[in-house]
Structure formats: C-alpha cells, structure tokens
C-alpha cells in the first residue's frame, strides 16, 4: 500500500538515481526498525543444492551489486539473497544513462556493464554485515579481460568469495559486457566449467566445506543450445542453473518509449521467454540438477508458474520496482499454498 503512494515520486526520478535512493532508504528504515514490522509470511522451507532455504523466494543479482545493503534486504522476508555481479577489479560500467523504465510494459532495460567496486570490497561488506542467511554471490569478468582469459577472472573471484557464500553463480549471460555470451558456446563453456569445477574441488578441500556452483544463462537460446548447455552442466556436475538473465529481444515492447535503447530487457516482457527456457531445461535435465527461475515475476501466480515449469527456487528483481517489497510476501505465501 505504502509503495503505491511513493512509486510515482520514484518514477519521476532518473531510474538509476531512484534505485540508489530506494536502497539508501531501505537501509535507514532497517536501522530505525521500520522494516519488517509486519509478521513475516510463513514460507515453505525447501532444500536445494544441499542448502536449507526458509522459503523459495530469493533476490536476483543486480540489485545489490556490492553487498552493501544486506541487512535492509534481508528484512523484506526473502529466503535467500544473491549479490553481485562482482568482478576481480573495480570498474565503472557503461556511461550513463544506462537504466530505462518501460512502464507500459512493466519492463526495464539496463546496460549497466557490471559496474561494481571489486570483489575485495564486496567481501568486506559481507563480513561487516553479519548476514547469516543464505547468500549467493554472482561473479563475472572484467570488461577488459578477453574471453580467452575469462576463466582467470572467474577463478580469482571464486577464490575470494568461496568462504563467504552459500553458493556461487557464474554469470556468462549478461548482454552488456561485449562478447560475454560467447562463453555459453560449447567449447568455451566446456573449458570454463572444467576450470571452475577443478578450483571448486580444491577450495572445498582447503576450506572443509563444499560451496555449490550455479550457472546463469540467457533467455535468447534455442532448444538445441539449451540441450547442449544442459548436457555440459550434467557432465561437469554443476550444482544448479539460473534461468534466465535479461533478453536482447524487443518484440514484446516494440514501439514503446525507450524500447530501442540497447541493453538487456527484464520484467514482464521476458516472462514467457524465461519460463520457456526453464521448461526446456527441465525436460533435458530430467531432475539431474535444480533450476532457479527468474524473469518477469510480478505476482505470486508468476512465481508459481516458474515452479510448475520446473524451477525449485525463484528470484525477483524488476518485479520489486513495479510492485514494491510486498511482492516478496505475496510470492512466499503463494508458493506455500
């Protein structure tokens, strides 16, 4: 109710400025004890990747890139939080403006470009937060690292976040880092997954704790590509797959203001494509590993549809922009029914 009153003011601001203001406001409200005053929704606990989740509704990566807002976000009732994408070295991302709303379609286009303050800063924030819930950390490569050396960046991040994450997501599907999606192709993906699984095994022995690895993929894949990725995930023993990232397609928003901005489209317009990928993955994986469904969840029924398509967990991001924090409770309650 409250969000519906303040949303017009937020939408009158530049999208990225509104994003920052909202997170700052959430932090202040949490410190004042104003977040989470309502009783939390009674969620249905689930076990996925060997991890116990208090409920199946998580925050998708991208909202809190540096892990600087964990306490405020945790108070909203999520079953888990995923922060990042983080890279080995700080980088500013793409020039502004780089975040655009499409209110008529309940969509968002972003070309942020993995802007973040670097993995060392993220780790410091996580430690300082004292957050004890289920935390996923999403890792990527720096813009100026060629694809031939991409594994070096992912391994550098994995080394540093391993001790602080309950699971780690390898992001090879953002459309906003040039040529990144080429890492989804057979030979490149095979080599990357081999390197990551080897390092995961070494780190598990070093830390005495196994931290699952998830791979985040794009919605802009045909069935043959999805089948090939599924086969590689199973062959390498990857622990989960996140479907999906944003889309470069514009069919669902053609003719709308901002529709021609470059970048990845999220929100309601990606819902069907994302669910299609979840369903196709489920068919090819046959339960071999869990799917985390993300893309276009703006209601409890949308969350339920992702689960029905084959997902074990869901994540929210753009839906929070359009529906507010009450969406978390709605989804948690719907999935508990």
Curated annotation (Swiss-Prot):
Keyword DNA repair tagged: no
Gene Ontology MF: a single term: dihydroorotate dehydrogenase (quinone) activity
Subunit note: Monomer.
Cofactor(s) it depends on: FMN
One Pfam family named in its UniProt record: DHO_dh
Role noted for this protein: Catalyzes the conversion of dihydroorotate to orotate with quinone as electron acceptor.
Keywords from the named record: Cell membrane, Flavoprotein, FMN, Membrane, Oxidoreductase, Pyrimidine biosynthesis
Cofactor binding comment, as recorded: Binds 1 FMN per subunit.
Organism: Thiobacillus denitrificans (strain ATCC 25259 / T1)
Gene: pyrD
Descriptive protein name: Dihydroorotate dehydrogenase (quinone)
């Amino acid at each position: 109710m409250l969000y519906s009153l303040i949303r017009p003011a937020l939408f009158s601001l530049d999208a990225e400025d509104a994003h920052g203001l909202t997170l700052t406001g959430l932090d202040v409200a949490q410190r004042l004890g104003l977040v989470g005053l309502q009783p939390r929704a009674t969620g249905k606990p689930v076990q996925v990747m060997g991890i116990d989740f208090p409920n199946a509704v998580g925050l998708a990566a991208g909202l809190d890139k540096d892990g600087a807002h964990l306490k405020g976000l945790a108070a909203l009732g999520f079953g888990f939080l995923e922060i990042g994408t983080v890279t080995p070295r700080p980088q500013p991302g793409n020039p502004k403006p780089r975040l655009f709303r499409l209110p008529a379609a309940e969509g968002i286009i972003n070309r942020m470009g993995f802007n973040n303050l670097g993995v060392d800063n993220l780790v410091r924030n996580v430690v300082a937060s004292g957050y004890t819930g289920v935390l996923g950390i999403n890792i990527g490569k720096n813009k100026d690292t060629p694809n031939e050396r991409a594994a070096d960046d992912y391994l550098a991040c994995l080394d540093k976040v391993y001790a602080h994450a309950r699971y780690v997501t390898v992001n090879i599907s953002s459309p906003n880092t040039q040529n990144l999606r080429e890492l989804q192709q057979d030979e490149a993906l095979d080599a990357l997954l081999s390197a990551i699984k080897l390092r995961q095994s070494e780190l598990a022995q070093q830390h005495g704790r196994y931290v699952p690895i998830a791979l985040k993929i794009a919605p802009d894949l045909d069935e043959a590509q999805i089948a090939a990725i599924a086969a590689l995930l199973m062959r390498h023993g990857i622990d989960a797959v996140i479907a999906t990232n944003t889309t470069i397609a514009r069919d669902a928003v053609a003719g709308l203001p901002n529709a021609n901005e470059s970048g990845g489209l999220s929100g309601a317009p990606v819902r069907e494509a994302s669910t299609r990928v979840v369903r196709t993955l489920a068919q090819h994986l046959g339960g071999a590993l869990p799917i985390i469904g993300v893309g276009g969840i703006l209601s409890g029924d949308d969350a339920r549809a992702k689960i029905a398509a084959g997902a074990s967990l869901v994540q929210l991001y753009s839906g929070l922009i359009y529906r507010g924090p009450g969406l978390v409770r709605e989804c948690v309650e719907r999935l508990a029914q």
